[in-house]
């Protein structure tokens, strides 16, 4: 660690303590060149997911957008807030576990669709109709026919 007083890279750690939450490590150090004592803090750098939108703009992943989309699709349906939050948490965890730090909005939409299909077919249909941009009744009819074939 570079000494803030003389700039030397030679130091020794005198004391190490972990925070109560276990997320920060505090180290007391002494410069071997000038004897100056200083404190450093270490914490895990959190990974951040970036979403590539349809228009190729990039924005930070926002779990609340997933929750809002599912809430809208599942209005007046037998899906709890806890289930919706769990879906959003599971999608975020999946992306981080897979190391997908840059992901398309289409892929996120597909993950939501897959979960809703298992949970509630009506909410699934509502979500797909908005996400895939259904424009008229014919789009619904075609989708329902293909959905029924898969069942």
Curated annotation (Swiss-Prot):
HAMAP family: NrdR. Transmembrane segments: none annotated. GO terms for molecular function: ATP binding; DNA binding; zinc ion binding. It comes from the Bacteria. Its cofactor is Zn(2+). Belongs to the NrdR family. Binds 1 zinc ion. InterPro entries: ATP-cone_dom, NrdR-like_N, RNR_NrdR-like. This is Transcriptional repressor NrdR. Negatively regulates transcription of bacterial ribonucleotide reductase nrd genes and operons by binding to NrdR-boxes. A zinc finger (unnamed) spans 3-34. The gene is nrdR. The keyword Repeat does not apply. Pfam families: ATP-cone, Zn_ribbon_NrdR. NCBIfam families: transcriptional regulator NrdR (TIGR00244). It comes from Sulfurihydrogenibium sp. (strain YO3AOP1).
